[in-house]
A protein has these predicted regions:
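A short beta-loop-alpha structural element at the N-terminal edge
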Residues: 1-12
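Conserved GNAT acetyl-CoA-binding A-motif
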Residues: 105-116
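A conserved beta-turn-beta hairpin within the catalytic core of GNAT-like acetyltransferases
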Residues: 68-79, 89, 136-137
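Conserved acetyl-CoA-binding loop-helix of GNAT-fold acetyltransferases
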Residues: 84, 90-103, 130
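A short helix-loop-beta-strand connector motif used in the catalytic cores of GNAT acetyltransferases and
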Residues: 39-50, 78
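Conserved beta-strand in the GNAT
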Residues: 51, 57-66, 83
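Conserved active-site alpha-helix within GNAT-family acetyltransferase domains
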Residues: 95, 107, 119-137, 143
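Conserved GNAT-fold acetyl-CoA-binding loop/helix
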Residues: 16-39
Length: 148
């Protein structure tokens, strides 16, 4: 497991295609994905993208975006874009990647890690619960400012 680089962006887009095919709110758009991935990779204050490689092939990824919580008065992480290719699931790769991401966040002074999953993705809910996450009472709301 290591940090993604700019040269990984095409393969990261392929992983995001897999993820977005499962998520109701998102559709793949490589131009926008490349822009966002580049911004994260190029600025460690924004976040980090962690990847799992098999030889030169990316088989999993997760990103951690950093912000400050006024409730905690400290840095926190938002875990996003967590995906492992289907043919590599159920063999511990996701668990290792998540554990690595949590440790990375802790070492980078994150006092809390938050993530979102689709409401009906029970497999993901069980996975995160097995790994120490719990359902928050907070409910996300979105406003797409380009649509207003």
């Amino acid at each position: 497991i290591d940090k993604a680089t700019l040269t990984d962006i095409p393969q990261l887009c392929t992983l995001l295609d897999e993820l977005f095919s499962q998520e109701a709110e998102f559709t793949p758009n490589h131009t926008l994905q490349e822009k966002g991935l580049s911004k994260i990779i190029s600025n460690e204050n924004v976040g980090v993208i962690l990847v799992v490689r098999e030889s030169q092939k990316l088989i999993g990824m997760v990103n951690i975006l950093f912000t400050i919580s006024t409730a905690l008065g400290e840095r926190v992480g938002n875990l996003e874009d967590f995906v492992v290719l289907p043919e590599y699931r159920n063999c511990g790769i996701g668990t290792k990647l998540l554990s690595y991401a949590v440790t990375f966040a802790e070492k980078n002074d994150c006092q809390r890690i938050t993530l979102l999953t689709d409401d009906d993705n029970e497999d993901a809910h069980r996975f995160y619960a097995r790994n120490g996450f719990y359902r928050s009472s907070m409910v996300p709301f979105r406003l797409n400012t380009l649509d207003t």
